[in-house]
Amino acid sequence: MSWQTYVDDHLMCEIEGNRLTSAAIIGQDGSVWAQSATFPQFKPEEITAIMNDFAEPGTLAPTGLYLGGTKYMVIQGEAGAVIRGKKGPGGITVKKTNQALIIGIYDEPMTPGQCNMIVERLGDYLIEQSL
């Protein structure tokens, strides 16, 4: 299965009638493995900042999480495993696997819980596959 298939079928899937607005699988080095057509163009330093927060949880909280120039307020996540952010009626979930970052971006009517479930389910599966 290609990485694009994971994005198309497992991240951009429908859940209770809702979908993520965009999603991607990004290597921990910032390389794009696969992404939805609407995923924002991000800067390498934004991925570096996310990786730094996984290494030292809490580093993004004072400044916020930036992706594609959009600032998300960092909310409760799982130290070293999941970073969650909020911006208005939407937000972002970033799940770290052994080699990649699974990123989902959502807006209403999708809920934070639905986004978390989609992103973390794929992340957990890839971790089980040692990816």
From Swiss-Prot:
It comes from Capsicum annuum. Belongs to the profilin family. This is Profilin. The keyword Signal does not apply. It is found in: Cytoplasm, Cytoskeleton. Binds to actin and affects the structure of the cytoskeleton. At high concentrations, profilin prevents the polymerization of actin, whereas it enhances it at low concentrations. By binding to PIP2, it inhibits the formation of IP3 and DG. One of its GO terms (molecular function) is actin binding. The keyword Cytoplasm applies. Pfam families: Profilin. One of its GO terms (cellular component) is cytoskeleton. Occurs in many kinds of cells as a complex with monomeric actin in a 1:1 ratio. PANTHER family: PROFILIN (PTHR11604:SF59). It comes from the Eukaryota. Keywords: Actin-binding, Allergen, Cytoplasm, Cytoskeleton.
